[in-house]
């Protein structure tokens, strides 16, 4: 028996649903009091059993969130050096070509061509003229600086027997560079100079206005403008990491030879959860201070139904990285699976931006009985839980399409399809899908035998 009472004019059942209620009777008992005597009248059965379709909502079918690796097979590195020019000159000075910057650049270019895991992809020359001197003069000047720098680099590469693609461009008046340098300077009237730049877009007008500011132009000529007369040479180098085959082999034979990101990446190359768990266990062993190993090991354990082990590893991840949304969401899944909705809600509130969050919220809302909110949270997700929310809001056509789109149908998928058949009075749909469901999970026979969704259909032969 369960407790009940009146709230206003409505009956309130005080006990929560338990599976035994599927096969039960709801009876009304009456007591009549006349004077000092009380009479018990015969009980009246008003309903049999409980339709518990909402209880099919399954937190363990949700996808926990992975904390991804940052592995990049190809990493682009850039090395630069500047060649400075004197005012209104484009010739390359010897001291500039022998500077520490240039020597370092040549060494990096040479190293890139000799290293087996590096590739020199491009050398770019960008030449500039300062904004004083007029557009026509500076165009010729910047163009000549580009030409001379390119010729120098071509000769240098040829001498070193280095083959590389080369690109080049020039900027006649480097107003952007001028603005940046002035902004970072300690020049007394720099705000006045910046205002001129914002007020006038014509380069000739800008130059005239700034030259009229005699109090600051001398400082500009000495401190700012010389820095804008240069060619910048940039070498782009690809550093090529280990192949998938190399990473997979090392993950099995010598995991310590891999970085944490390479080892995390190795787990994405295997197919089974057993293989993934073995790799994540190595991450935890070799890199115990990286929360991702614990989280991802817990993720695999959750998918395998080992909630206690998953909870333990999620907790370890949270201790190392307490503000990580993915870890918080996974802890929310544990709370949801344990019917601790207050903790689940708190955890999901810390999980903004996690891709898997909306589906988790969908199940949370279903567990709370807010089916419309669940449908909204699921959006266009194709899952059993999403279809269940649509069934509970009586959107049967959409639920059917959702179930048809489930990537890996399981016993629950076909059971829900049978429920849809019952809701739409399609006996063939009920029978065929129950057969499939029971063939995948024999416990579905017992579930169907007491499910009032199928009360009007002859399924006795299926559930023996």
Annotate the PLM regions:
Residues 296, 330, 360, 385, ...:
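Canonical tetratricopeptide repeat
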Residues 130-234:
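Periplasmic OmpA-like peptidoglycan-binding domain that tethers envelope proteins to the cell wall
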Residues 2-8, 13:
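Single conserved hydrophobic/aromatic residue that forms the stacking wall/gate
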Residues 65-67, 85, 90-126, 154, ...:
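Periplasmic peptidoglycan-binding/anchoring modules of Gram-negative envelope and division proteins
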Residues 268, 299, 333, 363, ...:
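Residue-level recognition of tetratricopeptide repeat
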Residues 435, 439-464:
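Terminal, low-structured helical/coil segments at or just beyond the last alpha-helical repeat
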Residues 303-304, 337-338, 367, 392-393, ...:
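Register position in tetratricopeptide repeats
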């Amino acid at each position: 028996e369960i407790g009940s009472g009146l709230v206003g004019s409505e009956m309130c059942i005080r006990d929560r649903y338990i599976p035994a209620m599927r096969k039960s009777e709801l009876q009304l008992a009456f007591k009549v009091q006349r004077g000092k005597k009380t009479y018990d009248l015969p009980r009246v059965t008003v309903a049999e059993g409980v339709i518990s379709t909402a209880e099919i909502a399954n937190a363990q079918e949700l996808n926990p969130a992975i904390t991804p690796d940052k592995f990049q097979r190809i990493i682009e590195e850039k090395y630069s050096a500047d060649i400075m020019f004197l005012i209104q000159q484009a010739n390359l000075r010897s001291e500039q070509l022998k500077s520490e910057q240039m020597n370092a650049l040549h060494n990096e270019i040479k190293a890139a061509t000799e290293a087996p895991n590096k590739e020199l992809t491009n050398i770019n020359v960008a030449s500039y003229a300062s904004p004083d001197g007029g557009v026509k003069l500076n165009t010729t000047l910047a163009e000549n600086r580009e030409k001379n720098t390119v010729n120098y680099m071509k000769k240098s590469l040829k001498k070193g027997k280095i083959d590389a693609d080369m690109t080049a461009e020039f900027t006649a008046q480097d107003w952007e560079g001028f603005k940046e340098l002035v902004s970072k300077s300690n020049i007394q009237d720099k705000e006045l100079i910046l205002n001129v730049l914002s007020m006038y877009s014509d380069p000739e007008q800008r130059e005239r206005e700034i030259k009229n500011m005699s109090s600051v132009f001398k400082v500009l000529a000495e401190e700012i403008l010389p820095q804008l007369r240069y060619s910048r040479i940039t070498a782009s180098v690809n550093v090529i990491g280990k192949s998938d085959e190399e990473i997979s082999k090392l993950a099995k034979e010598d995991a310590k030879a891999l970085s944490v990101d390479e080892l995390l990446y190795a787990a994405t190359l295997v197919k089974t959860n057993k293989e993934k768990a073995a790799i994540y266990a190595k991450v935890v062993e070799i890199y115990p201070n990286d929360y991702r190993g614990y989280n991802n090991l817990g993720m695999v354990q959750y998918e395998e139904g080992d909630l206690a082990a998953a909870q333990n590893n999620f907790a370890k991840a949270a201790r190392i990285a307490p503000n990580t949304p993915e870890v918080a969401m996974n802890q929310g899944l544990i709370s949801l699976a344990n019917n601790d909705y207050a903790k689940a809600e708190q955890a999901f509130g810390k999980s903004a931006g996690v891709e898997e969050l909306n589906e988790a919220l969908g199940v949370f809302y279903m567990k709370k009985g807010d089916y419309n909110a669940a449908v909204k949270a699921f959006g266009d997700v194709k899952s059993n839980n999403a279809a269940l929310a649509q069934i509970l809001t009586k959107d049967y056509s959409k639920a059917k399409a959702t179930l048809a789109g489930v990537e890996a149908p399981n016993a629950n998928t076909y059971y829900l399809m049978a429920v849809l058949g019952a809701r739409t009075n399609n006996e063939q749909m009920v029978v065929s899908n129950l057969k499939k469901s029971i063939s995948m999970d024999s416990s579905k026979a017992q579930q169907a035998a007491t499910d009032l969704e199928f009360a009007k259909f002859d399924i006795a032969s299926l559930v023996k």
